[in-house]
Amino acid sequence: MACTRRTKTLVSTCVILSGMTNILCLLYVGWITNYVNNNGNVKVAGRTHEKKFDVDSRGETLRIIERLDRLETVVNQHIQELPEKPLKDGEDTADQTLSDSLFAHWGHDLGPESRKVALKKFQYYGYNGYLSDRLSLDRAIPDLRPDGCRNISYPSSLPQVSIIFIFVNEALSVILRSVHSAIHRTPSHLLKEIILVDDNSNNAELSENLQRFVDETNQQRPDFIKVVRHNKQEGLIRSRVSGWRAATAPVVALFDAHVEFSVGWAEPILHRIKEDRTRVISPSFDNIKYDTFEIEEYPLSAQGFDWELWCRYLNPPKSWWTQKNQTAPIRSPALIGCFVVDREYFEEIGLLDEGMEVYGGENVELGIRVWLCGGSVEVMPCSRIAHIERAHKPYTEDLATHVRRNALRVAEVWMDEFKSHVYMAWNVPQQDSGIDIGDIREREALRERLRCKPFSWFLKNIYSEMRTYTETIAYGVLRNSLRPDLCLDQGPDSDNIPIMYICHGLTPQNVYYTSSQQLHVGGLSPTIDDDDNKCLVDVNGRPRLLECSYASNKHMKLSWLFTQGGSIQNRKSKRCLELVESADVDHGYQLALQQCSSQKWTITNILLGKVL
């Protein structure tokens, strides 16, 4: 799936090592269990509790989870400060991290050889392939639909669906469980065919053993399972289009090949599409834990995105809560990546953008395009599917590079004057970015042909929760002439004390200077429900990072006079932000507010048409 619930796992992919110019990528996984602790564990054996439907217009649960998610950046950049565990003989740091992740909640009774096999599979797949191979392909999973869903009846004349599974080097048992689940939990008169798209796997059993299963199934139901095999790896986006081209049913359902369907998943979606073929529908997702394969229930949510175009779960809109009907469709700004759509309408609306690379951003682009060009996007509470969220993605070494390129492509085609926000979020210049986004003329022509609305309409009418940053003048990393190898950094989030740190250009070092003379440090808060951005403030002569709205309401000293290549001076206190030598901190310099000297500051990028 093109998006995982990042609010549930903290996955650190980069450790910044002081004194080095390169980034050493490691894996550090921590499991956030606040939702489970508050609502009870959901086990595979069955549902252990009945949830009450509470009208929560503020969406406190989802906001708490999102706040935890924002700590990921700090973990990513400062994880090297944690004390190291002693390594076992013959074990390196990466092996230890993988072992800790896999065996924290599972496998305590395995012998040494079995642990080695399990760990090797975990490293290869990003989930517990060893355990998957030992689970039934037809295992029972809990029915986590809201209670009212079981009482809804649907017409018998619903359209048929082609289910498309995309995979590359997936565990065979996981693929087969996905297929078995689709067959046994989709009414036979509605399931026309299953299409398996193999994006050039090099795992032999996915050629021989999978084909044997397909042949045996097709002997009983001729041409029921089709296999599309790529001669070269095309990536998730083009693989989904390949699956669509092979489909023949009126409706297509595009899924990853590591899912399990809940009973009654198909009828609610097919009914909505029959009513209006311009609806693109996502089921509600639960989690298959990557280590234990237990099913974890997720709260009902819409699907949105931040300005980097990473998708994220959102609290359902207020209009949904006020209905007090937990079975009602949830209006959603975007899609997670697995979705169901009318086959012909999907072509009319432009399929997926095949000019994108590999993975990431295509789900956000589709949601934006559907809304702007006359369709709608919904999440169905009565349709639930469990999805494995990998501990790590083994099929690409540099996912962020692909997502960044794809995001800039989306921005240029669809976001009009707001495209600058995507460049700001990724900390790349609007001009001469050095990133080739490919030829976008065909997608621009599609937008014109479909007579799509401007992106401002989307922000006003569909994604009003999204924060905008039109006051920004300049952005990037902030360097001081005294030590140009160091950059202003937000430091440990709990301290609210900015620091100088070896420049790496990732989120903790993103700085934004606004027309109201504020200096925002750290990531851009995506929505109004998130914690506010942090602003640089003069607090009793000391530099501090405080929430901008709080500092403004308290009339604190958060306005700074700054010109490119000049000083940074607080308007009220007249003190300048400068570096002073200190033996007590890393890299020998700390920030101070003092009488202005000759120190100069520069920021990386100035927005087009702006003057600093």
Regions of interest found by a model, annotated:
Residues 252:
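Short aromatic/hydrophobic "clamp" motif used to bind/position activated sugar donors
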Residues 464-612:
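Lectin-like carbohydrate-binding module/patch detector with strong preference for beta-trefoil
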Residues 13-14, 50-56, 64, 68-184:
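N-proximal low-complexity "stem/linker" segments adjacent to membrane-targeting elements
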Residues 237, 312-344:
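A recurrent flexible, glycine/aromatic-enriched loop bordering the glycosyltransferase active site
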Residues 183-229:
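Acidic donor-binding segment of Leloir-type glycosyltransferases
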Residues 260, 264-313, 376, 382:
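Conserved donor NDP-sugar-binding/catalytic core segment of glycosyltransferases
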Residues 230-247:
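Glycine-rich, basic loop-to-helix element that forms the pyrophosphate-binding segment
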Residues 1-75:
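N-terminal signal-anchor transmembrane helix specifying type II single-pass membrane topology
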